[in-house]
Amino acid sequence: MLYHENFDVIVVGGGHAGTEAALASARTGQKTLLLTHNIDTLGQMSCNPAIGGIGKGHLVKEVDAMGGLMAEAIDHAGIQFRTLNASKGPAVRATRAQADRALYKAYVRNALENAPNLTLFQQSVDDLIVDQDRVVGVVTQMGLKFQAKAVVLTVGTFLGGKIHIGMESSSGGRAGDPPSIALADRLRELPFRVDRLKTGTPPRIDARSVDFSVLEAQHGDNPTPVFSFMGKREHQPRQIPCFITHTNEKTHDVIRNNLDRSPMYAGVIEGIGPRYCPSIEDKVMRFADKNSHQIFIEPEGLTTHELYPNGISTSLPFDVQVQIVRSMKGFENAHIVRPGYAIEYDFFDPRDLKQTYETKFISGLFFAGQINGTTGYEEAAAQGLMAGLNASLHSQGKEGWSPRRDQAYMGVLIDDLSTMGTKEPYRMFTSRAEYRLLLREDNADLRLTEKARELGLIDDARWARFNEKIENMETERQRLKSTWMNPNSAGIDELNKLLKTPMAREASGEDLLRRPEISYSDLTQLDAFAPALEDQQASEQVEIQVKYDGYIKRQQEEIEKSLRHEHTKLPADLDYKDVKGLSNEVVAKLTEAKPESIGIASRISGITPAAISILLVHLKKHGLLKKGEEE
């Protein structure tokens, strides 16, 4: 049966990737359909109740700068906000927030239900309609056919999902939800490389059964940071603490004595789990020298007693889970509300994607989220937004767009996935970015909002506020450049108290702000440089841009230099064994990958900057560099 109306874009799945994909497509004016197996689970946090963190917070800020929802939703649902790495440089500072699951999900659903150009429909998808290597629609579980110019699959852990608790396993997309078997089988018929991954979740605990008096409280920041560019502290709900406990030798003995009942160690689970979020049994075995592991006790919300013990993800049998939990300080009488479990699922090699998230084999078909081998809400949201945007552009017959590695962590994400692929669940870290001084949380809007406006993702209110901030920054920098003090100026005594050595010659406000011992707040408390900007976002940018000016310029020069060789062609018949100085490992990797350009070669795992320099010397020596590429 054919549905009575057609769509420009269909998004399959209503998780963090699917919601951003659907909203991005709808925001650009395309008639969009979001299909989900259950409308009540839209925006659900299937694992930990938190948004952000190192690298991840950067992605959330970028999604926000592109008009996405995640930052706005967590600002309305966050029950504890913190800035991580606050004492370090701005490049690695990151925002993280605990979420009230119910508030977060309700905010997301409300945004979806009220979005213009977006239709919701509750049905699982069993099949794709493909016409000569071009997707033209989908078929739902009840045989209903929907037609569209582009389809975005954001199916999370549902493709062939299998849940494990001890040696018992069952089919499922997550606890309480059925898997997507028919669609998984259909996708396996297409020319994609497919494999299995695994993730897991800890048991949930009833807070009323925990002795908090013996736990260490962990409070949020005051004042609280805000995620969204348009966010306000008054949007945030009541703030509450998290708590910390630890595993101990008793915990570890329980785990070691029951490894034969672990599906992971018994070989029942084939999928590879996330390296940076291992199960507790994996941690105990991999770090055998450690006597304890820190466990963060995270509230699931303001109106529930459920706790999320971050750090004891497990697939051990339920009776062992009870022993593990009750071995920890404060949890001697703990009651488990929901058992922990592991889940295996299909993912598709992201090297079969273009940089727009469109698949190389099926035109108009886009993948986003865990289907691409990633882990994490933030990584999913970033992919979803970009896939939804590019599906919209495809449906309009326009060229796709993706940021470069030097423009956004979103660019690092798709570039890593599409050039290197992944064998384990991929998560974002600031260390993955070569130009992280330029890719800060605080300047996500400056990097991306103008382009997002051009692409139709930014509304008038945000655009006006963005331009106001730019104007405030430019005016303030000009004021500081043109305001001077000398050793005889009024107020010099107050200034000298701030300086390591007394002022010896005339200096502008900008000169003084470059000094590490003087902050913008210090400077603008002096009469000569008062008043401070009321726009705190603008004043923060002024301070960072002035203090890091030299480093920023140096990194921009590095980018310009690297871009000169980004598209330098590598001959298809180049025999890498003839390139003197390359290691056998590098020769083998380049021979297998056959990269088309220096830029692609540079991003193959294991190809070092030194190897790229050797390649450039070889190309120059044999006259294979074009004019302008030889520097």
UniProtKB/Swiss-Prot annotation:
One of its GO terms (biological process) is tRNA methylation. One of its GO terms (cellular component) is cytosol. Transmembrane segments: none annotated. FAD binds at G13, G14, G15, H16, A17, G18, V125, S180, Q370. Belongs to the MnmG family. NAD-binding protein involved in the addition of a carboxymethylaminomethyl (cmnm) group at the wobble position (U34) of certain tRNAs, forming tRNA-cmnm(5)s(2)U34. This is tRNA uridine 5-carboxymethylaminomethyl modification enzyme MnmG. It comes from Vibrio campbellii (strain ATCC BAA-1116).
